[in-house]
Amino acid sequence: MNGAVTWTMTGSGYLNNSQLFDGNSKPTGTGLAFERDGYGVGLNDDEITTTPMRQEWIEVAFSSPVMVSAFYFLDLFQARTGGTLEIGQASIDGGAPVSLVAVDLAGTGAAGFVAAAFQPIYASVIRFTVLNSNDNLGYADGALAGIELAPVPVPAAGLMLLGGLGGLAMFRRRARA
């Protein structure tokens, strides 16, 4: 594999990202393209949905641990009447979940975009779901928009650089002599 990390995405049902982005404005500063409306579960649904009877999920597994530094969701909304809102969750390697709480009001044309950025942490498996809270329109749902990966530091690179500089210094001394 030459150091390449691969990933697989599975879900509690059919994975779907066929819905075009439908927000009235694209959030900036994330590096996301916002061409699609995120990943969801279901043949006719582009969202991860939770009902009183079931909780859908999406899981992303990496072939080797990667450093994750942010999660992005779309279609998480607050009820227009206040009080209730949708909450996306991401759990790294089965640990305590990171919660992404809706900030956009439902029915306003907003994208329902929520981001959670944090200090990079190693992850092999990330599970995404939505809590059974709601925006009072249908069921609690949201879509996985992205995972941000941080560069992985290479500890040996520093030693190689120092070794190379030391070799150059020694070569230079020999050339002067």
Question: Where are the model-predicted features located?
Answer:
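An amphipathic, hydrophobic-aromatic interaction surface with interspersed Lys/Arg
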Residues: 51-61, 76-77
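Short, surface-exposed beta-strand/strand-loop-strand elements in extracellular ectodomains
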Residues: 79-95
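C-terminal membrane-anchoring or membrane-association module
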Residues: 169-177
